[in-house]
Amino acid sequence: MGKYFSDAVDNAIEAIYYTYDREKAAAAVQPLADAANAGDGDAAYILSRCVSGPQYSWDYHPFQANDEAVEQLIRQSIVKGSAMGVLGAMRCGMLTPEMEEAMPFANLREAWNVVYEKAQAGCLFAMNMIGNTYFWLDIVRVEGKGPNDFPSKEAFGVWLRESELKCLPWFEKAFAGGMGFAGRNMYNLYNDGEEGVIAPDKSKAEAIARLGAEKGYPDWQERYAGFLISKEGRAQEALDLYFAAAKQGQLSSWFYIGKAFQEGKVVPKDCPQAMKCYELGLQDPNAIGCANRAGELLFHGKDGVPQDYARAVQFFEQAHAQKNTWGNDMLGTCYLFGYGCQKNPARALQLFQEVDYSTNLLNFGLGTLYTEGLGVPEDIKKGVEYFQKCKNYAPAQEALLKFK
């Protein structure tokens, strides 16, 4: 038996929530599954979190979301007597009356007390769970209280506010104790504030990020670097933190490192190195920024990066598939002129019309489409107006000579 739960559960919580190690997290899954199959309800609950999506653990753990498995595992955890499973089900809206009836606890308070006692005993994961029952006000359901239990609506509101703020000491203990994940809701509460509960306090939010960075949590190193990058004289410190985070597997940090090499403000400009950083970031297929910036370097093909329109199209399409239009002017230009892809004026027009920005490439592309009637009825006047919007752009100036 482990310190707080079974060995399999304690070891899994350690690997998944107290470290940022993909291999350790992956290795914890099979022992969890074996324990769950043997009737360990807590193991089933931790497994359910693994397949619930990145919002339930570190973004870069090697888990795949599976909604069907989540429901099955949550149900299994409750039936097998997991108090964590009960609180987790309540938090994600899965604690139906049927599920509540199936739990081997007299009431929700009894289940809450089990987790609370483990939090009191020092379990960081349990501390975070108790903090969340206050933060999300699940404690209202646990306590079984409502407006009619108070002398006035105002008194009920005061109780709600006081209850929500009780989350902070629990989050603070878990975060400082080694659970980087526990800082998320605490940070959001200070950074964004909540009307009627707490005013935004950016300095406290920054302090949380700084503490996380000092403790070596890669996601918090990245977040704190975001505070430092705009502060005078601290850009190099920010870049060092991005490097530290990236080396621990925080793939999103490669975007900021690549951007630093591409822009050459903090370090000497080195676009080939920037390209390498973006490609490292693209180990995460959802890395929109890296896809766009890599596409930009390949589209222009300068500063040491060979021009490669076909790869540029691939990267821009990857970003566009996630509803991002940052590179639409370049992607549309590729489709308009057949750079690295088949010519497709209709697709180019669609891409140009999706954006809310204005660039020379965009205006030149629209000017070309309208003056040549490509994919749209020819409209010389409209096309010329687009050419005229271009600023110091030789292709547009050359095109205008045809319409004097």
Regions found by a protein language model. Give the residues of each.
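Short coil/turn connectors between adjacent alpha-helices in alpha-solenoid helical repeat scaffolds
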Residues: 16-24, 53-67, 95-107, 136-164, ...
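Short helix-capping/linker turns of helical repeat alpha-solenoids
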Residues: 4, 38-41, 54-55, 59-60, ...
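Alpha-helical solenoid scaffolds that mediate protein-protein interactions
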Residues: 32-35, 77, 118, 174, ...
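N-terminal leader/linker segments that initiate helical-solenoid repeat arrays
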Residues: 1-27, 42
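Hydrophobic face of amphipathic alpha-helices that form TPR/SEL1-like repeat modules
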Residues: 14-15, 46-58, 88-98, 129-141, ...
